[in-house]
Amino acid sequence: MNTEAEQQLLHHARNGNAEEVRKLLAAMARMEVVADIDCKGRSKSNLGWTPLHLACYFGHKQVVEDLLKAGAKVNMLNDMGDTPLHRAAFTGRKELVLLLLEYDADSTVVNGSGQTAKEATHDKEIRNMLEAVERTQQRKLEELLLGAAREGRTAEVSALLSRPNPPDVNCSDQLGNTPLHCAAYRAHKQCVLKLLRSGADPSLKNKNDQKPLDLAQGAEMKHILVGNKVVHKALKRYEGPLWKSSRFFGWKLFWVVLEHGVLSWYRKQPDAVHNSYRQGCKHLTQAVCTVKPTDSCLFSIRCFDDTVHCFRVPKNSVQQSREKWLEAIEEHSAYSTHYCSQDQVTDDEEEDVVSAMDLKESLARAQTCQQRLDREIYNFLKMIKECDVAKDMLPSFLQKADIVSEASRETCVALNDCLNLFTKQEGVRNFKLEQEQEKNKILSEALETLATEHHELERSLVEGSPPVSILSEEEFYDALSGSESEGSLTCLEAVTAHSFEENEVPGSSGKHRMSEGKDCGGGDALSNGIKKHRTSLPSPMFSRNDFSIWSILRKCIGMELSKITMPVIFNEPLSFLQRLTEYMEHTYLIHKASSLSDPVERMQCVAAFAVSAVASQWERTGKPFNPLLGETYELVRDDLGFRLISEQVSHHPPISAFHAEGLNNDFIFHGSIYPKLKFWGKSVEAEPKGTITLELLDHNEAYTWTNPTCCVHNIIVGKLWIEQYGNVEIINHKTGDKCVLNFKPCGLFGKELHKVEGYIQDKSKKKLCALYGKWTECLYSVDPATFDAYKKNDKKNTEEKKNSKQTSSSEESDEMPVPDSESVFIIPGSVLLWRIAPRPPNSAQMYNFTSFAMVLNEVDKEMESVIPKTDCRLRPDIRAMENGEIDLASEEKKRLEEKQRAARKNRSKSEEDWKTRWFHQGPNPYSGAQDWIYSGSYWDRNYFNLPDIY
C-alpha cells in the first residue's frame, strides 16, 4: 500500500478538498496508485478514522458522495466503534445522514459507548428520521422472514434471525399470520423447528383466531406444535441497572446482564457491551426468586449452591421493572436447568430417529424398482432392434412403453420415500446436534463460573493460613494470587547464587560449570576455542494478559487436545524437539557420574540429572510448537561435551525421538517421548509417555526411567503455574540398584510444592541413600536413617504447631516459622548433588528462558550451510515469532499445517507409508518396551532425499 497516498486522502477528506480527493480516487481506479480507500489514520488528528468518517464529521458532502461512489465502506467502524452515520448524526448534518442512508448505512449499529446513531444525535429531526428508517428496515426484514417461512427457505430464516438486529420472530402479515403460522400451514418442518428454537410463540393467534396448530398440515407437524417434542426457545438477552447487596460494601449499582442462563454484573454498561471487567457472575441452574411484600424494590435469588444474592431495582417504574426481571430470571433458570439436567433421550425423540433397518428396507425397495426399470428398458430397446416397425406392431410398442413408464413411476416413488426418510433423519440429527451444542455452551459457562468461585475460595484459604512447616515456601502464594513473579524470581536468584558459591559440587570441573548460568556472551566470538552464544532473543515476548487459553479450550470440549490448533500467541519460539534438548542443560552431571567408581554415587548423579531435566519448565507456560512430521534438530556443544540429534517420527500420535552422545565416547543418552494430554476442567495435564535411557559406556551400565507428569493450572481463571508430580523409578540394569523419586503434588496449602524425595535401594530393597530437594532448585543426598529421623521429627513439630494454634491464638505470631535463607531446609550431613543456575535478568521478557534455552534456535550462515533443510532453526513460523513478527508467525504456522495435511492426503491416495530417516522402531534393549532407536549415519552429513516440509 502507498502510505503517502493514504495520508493525502485522509488530509483532503478532512479539509474538504473535493477536487484532490477525486484525483486520488481516479488514480486508484486506474491502478496508478495503490491505496486503501478505507485506510485509518495514524496521526493525532485522525487516529483510527477513515476518510469517510472525517468527511462526515466535518460536513463535506461532495467528498462523502465521491467516496461512497468509489466504494468506501459505509458501515466501517473507527477505533471508538462509530460508523460514519454516528459522526454525521452527532454533528447534526441532515443531508449527510440522508446520503449515507441512501447507500444502505445501518442505523442499528451500536458504538463503543453503547449508542446507536439515533441515540448519539442531539437533533430531534435527525432522530425522527432515523427512527422512521429503523421502522422501515425492520418491516422489510419482517417481510423477508415471512416470505422465507412461507417458502420453507430454512437457511434464509436462520440467516435473518442470526443478524445483529434480527426481525421480530413473532411479526405478522396482513392476516395476522406469524412466520410460525406460515411455515406450519405449508408443512415446512425444518422451518418450524428453527422458528421454535429462535423463540417463536406457538400460542399466538391470527385475525381468524387461529393458532399455528390449527393451520398445521399433517400429524407430524401437529405433534411438534402440541409440544410433545422437547423444543425450548432461545432466550433473549435481558439487561439493565440493578443495585446489588454486598456483605462488606453494602448496596452498589451495577449493570446486570442475563444471557444463556447466566447472571453477570458489570460496573458500567460499555463493559457489558464488550464483555470486559466483569465483576461477578452466577449460573442460574435451579435458581429460585423470592420477594418481600413489604418492599416493592427488593428481590433475592437463591442459587443451586444455596448462596443468596439480593438485588434492588431502581425506583423509577419499580413494579413493572421488577416484574420483568423476575420473569426473565425465571425463564433463564428454567432454560439452564433443562440443559444441565437433560441426560436421557425421551421416548418421543427416539421414535423420530429412523432405525437403520427402516433405512435399509427403504433402500432395498428402491434398488428392486430400479432393477425392474433397467430390465424393462433393456427389453424395450431389444424389441426395437429386432423388429421392423409396422402398423400392426405399434400396439405392442405402446404397451411396452406403458410398462416402462409405470416402472419409472414406481422407481421415483420408492426413491422419494427413501429420500424423505433420509431427510427426516437429517432433521432429527440436526435438532439433536443443536440441543447438544446449546447444552455444551451452558455447561462450559457453568464450569467457568464454578472455577472462578473455587479460585476465590482457594485464595481466601491460602491468605488466611500460616505456614505449617519449615519446608513450606512462600512463592506458592504468588502462584495462586496472580501477583507478579519478578520479586520471587530475583530473591531465588540471590539465594541460589549465594549457595552456589558455598556448596559447589565436589569434583566438578570448570568446564562443567559453564552450563550453570555463567554469561555466555554474544555473537560469534571465540573464547579459548569455544564459541560464545547469544544471551537474549532478537525480540521480547508479547504480553498474553489479553488472551485466555480457556477461550480456546471451551470450544474444543470433547476433542483430542493434541489435535487442537492453538493461536500462536500461546506459543514460545521453540519446537518441542528443542524443548526436549533442554534435558542436556546439566550434562556435567553425566560426565561426573562417568568419573565416579562407586555405583551408588553414580546413581546419585543420574538421579540429579533426571531431576534437573525438568527444572527448566518452571514458569515456562508457553507451548512449544508442534513438530512437523520429519522435522529434525541437532545441537553440538563442544563446551558441554555432547552432540544430539532428534526427529519427529510420528504425527498422530505425536512422538519425538532423540539420541545424544558424549564427544569423548563416555555416554549415550536416548529415548522417545509421546506427551499424552488430558483436560481436567481447571488444568491441563501432560503425561510424557516413553522411556529415557542413559548408558555410561566406561562402566557398561544402562539406566532407564520415565519423566514425571507435568500439569498447568488455572486454565480458566488466575495466573498460570506449573507443577510436576508422580513417581520416577530409575533402574540400573547392571547392578539392580533402583532409585525411586516422588515428585510431590503441592496440595491445598502448598506445603509440598516442587518437593522431590526418594531413596536409592539395592536389589534387595535395602535403603542405601536418601535424596531430597526441589525440582526447581536443588537436590541433596543424605544418610537414609538421618532423613527418616528428620521426617519423623518434622511431622511431630507440625502437629504441635497445629495444637498450639488451636489452644491459644495469642501465641500465633511467636509460633510462625522464620523463613530460612534456603527455601529447602538442609539436613545436617547432606551433600549437594545439583543446584539450578539463576536465570538471566531478562528471562521474564524472553519467555522465561534459561541461558541454555536462549541459544537453542540460534543460527548463523556457517551453521545454515551444514544443517539439513528439515532442522527446526529453518522453520519460518518459529523464526518469525522469535523476531517478534506475530502476524507472520501465525500465517506461516497455518501454511505449514495445511502443507502437512496436504502431504498426508497425497500419501493416503498413493497408499505410501511415511518412512523415518534417522530412527527406526524397535524394543528398548534394556527395558524391552517399544522404543525408537537411532539408525546412525546422521553425522556423515549426507542429506539426500529429505522431505520438503517448510
Swiss-Prot record:
Residue positions, PTM Phosphoserine: S499
**Subcellular location per the Swiss-Prot or TrEMBL entry:** Late endosome
An annotated GO cellular component: late endosome
Q: Where is the PH domain?
A: 235-334
Single biological process term from Gene Ontology: lipid transport
Expression sites (tissue/organ): Ubiquitous.
In the UniProt entry, what is the domain comment?
Answer: The FFAT motif is required for interaction with MOSPD2. The FFAT motif is required for interaction with MOSPD2, VAPA and VAPB.
Q: How does it assemble?
A: Interacts (via FFAT motif) with VAPA and VAPB. Interacts with the GTP-bound form of RAB7A. Interacts with OAS1B. Interacts (via FFAT motif) with MOSPD2 (via MSP domain).
List the PANTHER family.
OXYSTEROL-BINDING PROTEIN-RELATED (PTHR10972), OXYSTEROL-BINDING PROTEIN-RELATED PROTEIN 1 (PTHR10972:SF53)
Briefly, what is this protein's role? Binds phospholipids; exhibits strong binding to phosphatidic acid and weak binding to phosphatidylinositol 3-phosphate. Stabilizes GTP-bound RAB7A on late endosomes/lysosomes and alters functional properties of late endocytic compartments via its interaction with RAB7A. Binds 25-hydroxycholesterol and cholesterol.
Q: What is this protein called?
A: Oxysterol-binding protein-related protein 1
Source organism: Mus musculus (Mouse)
- The encoding gene: Osbpl1a
